[in-house]
Amino acid sequence: MIDLTGRTVMITGASRGIGAEAARIFAKAGANVALVARSADSIANLAGEIGTSAVAIPCDISRYWEVAQAVENCVTAFGGLDILINNAGVIEPIARMDEADPEGWGQVIDINLKGVFHGMRAALPVMENAGGGTILTVSSGAAHGPVEAWSHYCASKAGAAMLTMCLHKEMGDKGIRAMGLSPGTVATQMQREIKASGINPVSQLEWSDHIPADWPAKALLWMCGTEADAFLGEEISLRDEGIRKKVGLV
């Protein structure tokens, strides 16, 4: 396991699923963990589970000032910020474009796309001053192709993937390591919401078809090591058996 003793990671969407598993795994690797999510009770409970190396920071990532404050709180708690994991994301309301609620559609963009930018923008000055850092964004296969009734999700994930590429282009030579992770379908609450919609082929998958949340969490940890430097500015797919072997999943 990669040793992150003395390093600090901030994880958005840390209240459940991939984010919560990443928090546990990064803490086991020795990192200080800043848990960011709207669900204050959930992240407080998780921080209590992890112990003194974790701090809960309630935050709505769709609001930049809250994200900036979260970064400030993280730095106050642990003295810096070495790794940012943009994990928070939503998929509801699932609807075809001719029936989609414009406000709900826009809220997905606010969280999945603007939230990623907000995290990057708030973290970068801290990382630049420290001489570098790592920014990882949880992506999706939906970033690369259309899925029925997911126009909001596909558009937001495509935009977030482009942010990773732009960040690498602008800051890669300044010590900022930027990468995306496309985990495939993961056994989380989001898949329950997709299943309930019954609209597209993804909703027809069985629970056993999805990978456990600790797989992408372990991949995110691996991406913090030098072995992943070959993928800087790119998106890594956990559907790739070669990547699964590198991460130690198979």
Spans of features found by a protein language model:
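Conserved glycine-rich cofactor-binding loop
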Residues: S15-R16
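The beta1-alpha1 cofactor-binding region of Rossmann-like NAD(H)/NADP(H)-dependent oxidoreductases
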Residues: P58-Q69, P102
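Substrate-binding pocket helix/loop in short-chain dehydrogenase/reductase
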Residues: A95-M97, G104-G106
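Active-site helix of classical SDR
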Residues: M120, S156
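Residue(s) in the substrate-gating loop at a strand-loop-helix junction
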Residues: S140
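Active-site-adjacent segment of SDR/Rossmann-fold oxidoreductases
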Residues: G145, C166-I176
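C-terminal helical subdomain
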Residues: G180-P183, T188, S197-K246
